[in-house]
Amino acid sequence: MSLKPYFSLLYSSPTNVKLSNFLIAQQPSGDLKTTPAEEFSPLVEKFNRRLLLGVGSSSVLAIGANFGGTTSFILGLSPGIGRNLKLDVIYPIGGYSRCIDTVEGFEFIYPATWVGDQTLLYRAAEKSERENSLDLPPARNSRRKNVNEPVVAFGPPGSTGELNVSVIVSPVSPSFSIEAFGGPKEVGEAIVRTVTGSGQRADLKGTLLESSIRQDSERNLKYYELEFKVESPLFRRHNVAVCCAHSGRLYTLNAQAPESAWSEVKSEIYTTAKSFNIIS
């Protein structure tokens, strides 16, 4: 059985993000003796209770706009509660924002300074305009959506796209199972072979570094977490991918970085990958 129908490296964006995936508060100056976090720490327990109570009565709206990063700072005092309430969709918490796609059914957090891929945003706007249009759809030449194209992608503003995270959702048979390809190591090695063209390109080398399974026993879901690097004379890239099959869909989150920047961004990449969950 071949993985090629399910994993590929076909996407390339001409604007903010160029991907190579498989389907796969300012502090004032002065003599301050305590930091803002130390001053606020006695209020954390009280804040936790009030935040939980406030949600039930809608008083959480009193937090208001994120002026000067104040809201994000306060929520950062208790990041677990804020994230459980999905407040990081609106306000960054602990340096991360949340992406929730209720249509495709997944979520993850990503560095709050990153922005969405403009090509995908424009395409989504065009799709919405077409769906809301009163005009009849064209009878011919309707372009089929590329199933290997990410539904979301984020990266640092103004970057070349070498550092990014994206999610691809592909339709598969309801009976499709990643487990059929073997354990995490076998799956990882097969994906690396697919990414590198199964050895057909002598100048492209892939190495599987880590492979594991994160299991959601409550929902009977298995997330295959893979770390690998791809090297060629033109680039050296470090990837962390998460794959999960559910209800006739194959979900693949791929986070990548230049090998030269890996030591600086690996904590953010790992955090993003570990946060990926299916919510459908």
From Swiss-Prot:
Signal peptide: none annotated. It comes from the Eukaryota. Residues 1-36 form a transit peptide. The keyword Chloroplast applies. Gene3D superfamilies: Mog1/PsbP, alpha/beta/alpha sandwich. One of its GO terms (biological process) is photosynthesis. GO terms for cellular component: chloroplast thylakoid lumen; extrinsic component of membrane; photosystem II oxygen evolving complex. InterPro entries: Mog1/PsbP_a/b/a-sand, PsbP_C. The keyword Repressor does not apply. GO terms for molecular function: calcium ion binding. PANTHER family: PSBP DOMAIN-CONTAINING PROTEIN 7, CHLOROPLASTIC, PTHR31407. Belongs to the PsbP family. This is PsbP domain-containing protein 7, chloroplastic.
